[in-house]
Curated annotation (Swiss-Prot):
It comes from Treponema denticola (strain ATCC 35405 / DSM 14222 / CIP 103919 / JCM 8153 / KCTC 15104). The keyword Ribonucleoprotein applies. Part of the ribosomal stalk of the 50S ribosomal subunit. Interacts with L10 and the large rRNA to form the base of the stalk. L10 forms an elongated spine to which L12 dimers bind in a sequential fashion forming a multimeric L10(L12)X complex. This is Large ribosomal subunit protein uL11. The gene is rplK. Pfam families: Ribosomal_L11, Ribosomal_L11_N.
Length: 143
C-alpha cells in the first residue's frame, strides 16, 4: 500500500454533534478541496456520544487525492474549567476579580480528561498546568 501524500493539516474547534458546513468549517475546508458536508457528517457521527455542543478540537489531515482523515482531541482546559465552575466566561481582571472556585476533585477530573493531550508525565504535573489555566481565567483553585 502506497503512502498518501499529505497536502495540509487543518486545526478547527467544532461543537460536538452540532457541526455544520457553515463558517468556520466550510471556508476552512473548501480551499483544500475537502467536502465540508462529508466531514461534518463523519465528525457528528464520531462525537454524538459526547455532550452536545461541547467544543472539540479536531486536526484534519488532507491528502493529495482530496481525501482526509481527522483526529479528535480533548476539549480545551478553559471550556472544562468553565463547565466545572458553572460560569459563562473567565474574569477580565484575573488577579483582582475572581469569578468562581475550582475544587480539588474537579481539578483532578479535568487533569485526567486532558492527560492524553497535555504535555505532562504524571497527574500531578497535569493538575499544576490546569490550575495555572484556571488562575489565569480568574478562577480560584482549592488547595
Amino acid at each position: 500500500m502506497a503512502k498518501k501524500k499529505v497536502v495540509t493539516q487543518i486545526k478547527l474547534q467544532c461543537p460536538a454533534g452540532k457541526a455544520t458546513p457553515a463558517p468556520p468549517i466550510g471556508p476552512a475546508l473548501g480551499p483544500h478541496g475537502v467536502s465540508a458536508p462529508q466531514f461534518v457528517q463523519q465528525f457528528n457521527d464520531r462525537t454524538k456520544s459526547m455532550e452536545p455542543g461541547l467544543v472539540i478540537p479536531v486536526v484534519i489531515t488532507v491528502y493529495a487525492d482530496k481525501s482526509f482523515t481527522f483526529i479528535l482531541k480533548t476539549p480545551p482546559a478553559s471550556v472544562l474549567i468553565k463547565k466545572a465552575c458553572k460560569i459563562e466566561k473567565g474574569s477580565a481582571t484575573s488577579v483582582t476579580a475572581k469569578v468562581g472556585k475550582l475544587s480539588k476533585a474537579a481539578l483532578e477530573e479535568i487533569a485526567k480528561t486532558k492527560m492524553p493531550d497535555i504535555n505532562a508525565n504524571d497527574i500531578e504535573a497535569a493538575k499544576k498546568i490546569i490550575a495555572g489555566t484556571a488562575r489565569s481565567m480568574g478562577v480560584e483553585v482549592e488547595r
